[in-house]
Amino acid sequence: RTAVSSSDLKKVTGQKPSGAMRIKAGATDFDPDYYVNFEEIGTKHPIFRCWHISEDYFLLQLYKKGAEDMINGGTSADVSELAVFKAEDQTIMPVTGLPADGKFGGEPYGEKGYAYMAVTVTTGEKPAFYKIDAKTGKAVKGLTVEADAITTVGKMEYLSK
């Protein structure tokens, strides 16, 4: 499926399901023996976004109500579901431990087998960072921020000369 945008419209077109292909190290073409249809495994929901965590683990942000909501919902489609994809095993594991009304910041940060995601809730609580274990899919609440929302998370590192 392809997303098309204009200043007042965002709509998904096409019929292909969300999926993954790979290019093996040193190759220049897609591996013809590797294709994963995300809409046939895990929660069977299409992908909104995908980020590398570590090794062959990827954090997926999914359309929680499935393909129909993705196609008809436009910018109001529910994208509040996270899952971990393990590429070698071709498995998807839902992330647990997140608030039910969580909305996610733009970019997570991945390091040493964990993804760190900014989460804002609608219940009046302050936003917080959640640490997601790539191998278990378990999210644990970390630092709470005195703000209305958090848009992203990252790491700054001082490089000495």
Where are these regions (language model features)?
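Short glycine/acidic-enriched loop and turn motifs that connect beta-strands
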Residues: 4-9, 64-70, 121-125, 160
